Amino acid sequence: MALSVEEKAQIVNEYKQAEGDTGSPEVQVALLTANINKLQDHFKANGKDHHSRRGLIRMVNQRRKLLDYLKGKDTTRYSALIGRLGLRR
């Protein structure tokens, strides 16, 4: 269910702020969003997988916290990221 190394590298390259950047809020939120989307597809086929649902909820909460941090820090970067990822906030 996890992202492959190639998928992670592609996401990091797309959302990085500088060379070697893997920890900026934009990269972290993009990686979490990709994982969340994969898990949502998993739950369409496996509706009773409650153990993995707990992990999904944890990822959604972590993404929300990072987005709240970014919104308080720099609203233009926040708005740009929301638009690029297609999140509704």
Curated annotation (Swiss-Prot):
Superkingdom per UniProt: Bacteria
Keyword Coiled coil belongs to the record: no
PROSITE patterns listed in its UniProt record: RIBOSOMAL_S15
Record has Kinase as a keyword: no
BP terms from Gene Ontology: translation
Coiled coil: none
Protein name in UniProt: Small ribosomal subunit protein uS15
Organism: Stutzerimonas stutzeri (strain A1501) (Pseudomonas stutzeri)
Encoding gene, per UniProt annotation: rpsO
